[in-house]
């Protein structure tokens, strides 16, 4: 089992459907009340990319990609067109989009993350697959053009010199979702006009 640092074809993923999934246990009591407990601390995303296939060449590209990943065996990158930036979809990325930590004077590494807030509640999503060339970093709201690097396979930002104590570290970026195929079978249909289709191509988010 390995992770292949290659992205599922963008022209096909653009037409896909899917999104976050949560796992909640709901128990109905004799009184009619409910008890609800979260089984997962974090959400997991599912997608179906069959909707993005529009022509026979798209079908061939998916089959080749599936074979190269050995079905469910190897993970890969996927661009979720509904959520792939550190900012709102209509906005441009800036170096101050997301807070990723606070300097201690000794800590040199910081994990990229994205916050989802509504009301008083916030969920923090760890970003492990930033897109190369899109990451921007700021210290105390001032963009840093040098003095740091980012590992695009882990999402870890490393500073040459540790940010001083109390300095807010922020970042902006595009990112992919680490996924795998959720089936070892592709059910391909080819009609008389040689137009192909696949009923479903499920993808499942994985932890890397």
Task: Describe every region a protein language model picked out.
Residues 36-37, 98-99, 158-161:
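Beta-strand-rich interaction surfaces with strong enrichment in secreted/lumenal proteins
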